[in-house]
Amino acid sequence: MSRIEALPTHIKAQVLAEALPWLKQLHGKVVVVKYGGNAMTDDTLRRAFAADMAFLRNCGIHPVVVHGGGPQITAMLRRLGIEGDFKGGFRVTTPEVLDVARMVLFGQVGRELVNLINAHGPYAVGITGEDAQLFTAVRRSVTVDGVATDIGLVGDVDQVNTAAMLDLVAAGRIPVVSTLAPDADGVVHNINADTAAAAVAEALGAEKLLMLTDIDGLYTRWPDRDSLVSEIDTGTLAQLLPTLELGMVPKVEACLRAVIGGVPSAHIIDGRVTHCVLVELFTDAGTGTKVVRG
């Protein structure tokens, strides 16, 4: 018997009753989820995440999943004997590296998640920006020691084909998005998944953006455990941005972009918690940091 099955019936009923206001608020709304970290590699967490997506779909909520795959790309490059290079925290993406990224993101990571979700019903569809030009890229550079530096086939989201994406949602599908997209000349670029998730959430008019991480939420004075915040506004967060740990910066920038762009709230949540999405969306306590306009 599982721990959930062992709970008294009245406790189960109380949990469901607590979820009702949130279910009503989110019914018919789009929720964009950036999937990554431990939730993408631990088998129990992967299966729980897939079940969460199916749960949302069956509650009349429209999840859209945007996933990364940096560690998996690195592992495949090593297996193939291809040297990887990083500049300014970004992977230098040569045509050879891009071929590996496409294979891993769409052919491995995306496929695995699609299959896990579809174990619950015919819901998930794996896509990239190349499909029906769902989104396009514009090449980007990074600043290293004050100098603009080329990092190859790495882009930012330029435009999102909102109508095509919403067609999938309206058909009851769960888009599972691998962040590869062509530029204006048809040259495919790899896009940071945090950046892409924010752009998709903004374009679709999502009700929420959820960013799965491997920490409890946002710490304003890391590693001070007492500095974890449950809610923060965009003005305060923007001022805090230069002081944050490097790994948190893309996630915080994504939250800022989404909320300033019209998404009512963005959430940095602990992907190490089983069913973290349901905990954040449907309980009063939540499991991370909520970012709101302010």
Swiss-Prot record:
<keyword id="KW-0808">Transferase</keyword>
<feature type="site" description="Transition state stabilizer">
    <location>
        <position position="34"/>
    </location>
</feature>
<keyword id="KW-0418">Kinase</keyword>
<comment type="function">
    <text>Catalyzes the ATP-dependent phosphorylation of N-acetyl-L-glutamate.</text>
</comment>
<dbReference type="InterPro" id="IPR041727">
    <property type="entry name" value="NAGK-C"/>
</dbReference>
<dbReference type="Pfam" id="PF00696">
    <property type="entry name" value="AA_kinase"/>
</dbReference>
<dbReference type="GO" id="GO:0005737">
    <property type="term" value="C:cytoplasm"/>
</dbReference>
<dbReference type="GO" id="GO:0042450">
    <property type="term" value="P:arginine biosynthetic process via ornithine"/>
</dbReference>
<feature type="binding site">
    <location>
        <position position="91"/>
    </location>
    <ligand>
        <name>substrate</name>
    </ligand>
</feature>
<keyword id="KW-0547">Nucleotide-binding</keyword>
<dbReference type="GO" id="GO:0006526">
    <property type="term" value="P:L-arginine biosynthetic process"/>
</dbReference>
<dbReference type="InterPro" id="IPR001057">
    <property type="entry name" value="Glu/AcGlu_kinase"/>
</dbReference>
<dbReference type="InterPro" id="IPR037528">
    <property type="entry name" value="ArgB"/>
</dbReference>
<keyword id="KW-0963">Cytoplasm</keyword>
<dbReference type="InterPro" id="IPR004662">
    <property type="entry name" value="AcgluKinase_fam"/>
</dbReference>
<keyword id="KW-0055">Arginine biosynthesis</keyword>
<feature type="binding site">
    <location>
        <begin position="69"/>
        <end position="70"/>
    </location>
    <ligand>
        <name>substrate</name>
    </ligand>
</feature>
<comment type="similarity">
    <text>Belongs to the acetylglutamate kinase family. ArgB subfamily.</text>
</comment>
<keyword id="KW-0028">Amino-acid biosynthesis</keyword>
<dbReference type="InterPro" id="IPR001048">
    <property type="entry name" value="Asp/Glu/Uridylate_kinase"/>
</dbReference>
<protein>
    <recommendedName>
        <fullName>Acetylglutamate kinase</fullName>
        <ecNumber>2.7.2.8</ecNumber>
    </recommendedName>
</protein>
<feature type="site" description="Transition state stabilizer">
    <location>
        <position position="251"/>
    </location>
</feature>
<comment type="pathway">
    <text>Amino-acid biosynthesis; L-arginine biosynthesis; N(2)-acetyl-L-ornithine from L-glutamate: step 2/4.</text>
</comment>
<feature type="binding site">
    <location>
        <position position="190"/>
    </location>
    <ligand>
        <name>substrate</name>
    </ligand>
</feature>
<keyword id="KW-0067">ATP-binding</keyword>
<dbReference type="InterPro" id="IPR036393">
    <property type="entry name" value="AceGlu_kinase-like_sf"/>
</dbReference>
<dbReference type="GO" id="GO:0003991">
    <property type="term" value="F:acetylglutamate kinase activity"/>
</dbReference>
<dbReference type="GO" id="GO:0005524">
    <property type="term" value="F:ATP binding"/>
</dbReference>
